[in-house]
């Protein structure tokens, strides 16, 4: 029997990533848009609080278990910014192009280009689940001076992986899922799900 799980996101590319990662467990991922669920507020100062709030919101409005992630780019020279504000770094409406341009602008003249992506994934079996499953992952790299690559989304075109000589936006989806912060968080979550199923 296939388990159904609501993804608390309207990001189509994130939905594809999550579906690919959860399919081996026989879990059908449904986007929250299938239930006309609006995006949850993300007012919290930490990734874990935002991920949990989004998962609880989707579970409450769908009546199904829900999974959410909150991810962001943390740049050393910017004191960890954009961090939890990564999607809205350049303000509303959200725009990957404007966020990337602002990041390049803020790092102009900085020799320290170190950065990492961080992801927290939260899964709740119901809206009031007292024992949510929470997992996280990191992905380290550096920030380029100009974007490269057409795959991925967000800051992927600027996020350079020195050991591969490529940006995240130059990787194919399978390799990205193997290496990425979200992939690492999902692998940790999958390990937990194997002992504490839906």
From Swiss-Prot:
EC number: 3.6.1.66
Positions bound to Mg(2+): 41, 70
Active-site annotation: 70
Xref: InterPro entries: dITP/XTP_pyrophosphatase (IPR020922), ITPase-like_fam (IPR029001), RdgB/HAM1 (IPR002637)
UniProt cofactor note: Binds 1 Mg(2+) ion per subunit.
UniProt superkingdom: Bacteria
Keyword vocabulary terms for this entry: Hydrolase, Magnesium, Metal-binding, Nucleotide metabolism, Nucleotide-binding
Keyword Magnesium found: yes
Keyword Ion transport set for record: no
One Gene Ontology CC term in the entry: cytosol
GO biological process: nucleotide metabolic process; purine nucleoside triphosphate catabolic process
Subunit structure: Homodimer.
Physiological role: Pyrophosphatase that catalyzes the hydrolysis of nucleoside triphosphates to their monophosphate derivatives, with a high preference for the non-canonical purine nucleotides XTP (xanthosine triphosphate), dITP (deoxyinosine triphosphate) and ITP. Seems to function as a house-cleaning enzyme that removes non-canonical purine nucleotides from the nucleotide pool, thus preventing their incorporation into DNA/RNA and avoiding chromosomal lesions.
NCBIfam families: RdgB/HAM1 family non-canonical purine NTP pyrophosphatase (TIGR00042)
Protein name from the UniProt record: dITP/XTP pyrophosphatase
């Amino acid at each position: 029997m296939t388990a159904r799980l609501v993804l608390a996101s309207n990001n189509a590319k994130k939905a594809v990533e999550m579906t690919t990662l959860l399919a081996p467990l026989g879990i059908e991922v449904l986007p929250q848009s299938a239930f006309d669920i609006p995006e949850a507020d993300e007012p919290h100062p930490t990734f874990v609080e935002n991920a949990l709030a989004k998962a609880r919101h989707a579970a409450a409005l769908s009546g199904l278990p829900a999974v959410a992630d909150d991810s962001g780019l943390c740049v050393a020279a910017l004191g960890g910014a954009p961090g939890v504000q990564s999607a809205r770094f350049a303000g509303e409406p959200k725009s990957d192009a404007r966020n990337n341009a602002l990041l390049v602008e803020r790092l102009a003249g900085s020799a320290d280009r170190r950065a990492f992506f961080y992801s927290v994934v939260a899964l709740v079996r119901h809206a009031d689940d007292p024992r949510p499953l929470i997992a996280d992952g990191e992905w380290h790299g550096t920030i380029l001076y100009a974007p490269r690559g057409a795959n991925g989304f967000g800051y992927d075109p600027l996020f350079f992986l020195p050991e591969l000589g490529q940006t995240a936006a130059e990787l194919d989806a399978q390799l990205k899922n193997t290496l990425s912060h979200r992939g690492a968080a999902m692998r940790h979550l999958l390990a937990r799900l194997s002992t504490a199923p839906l």
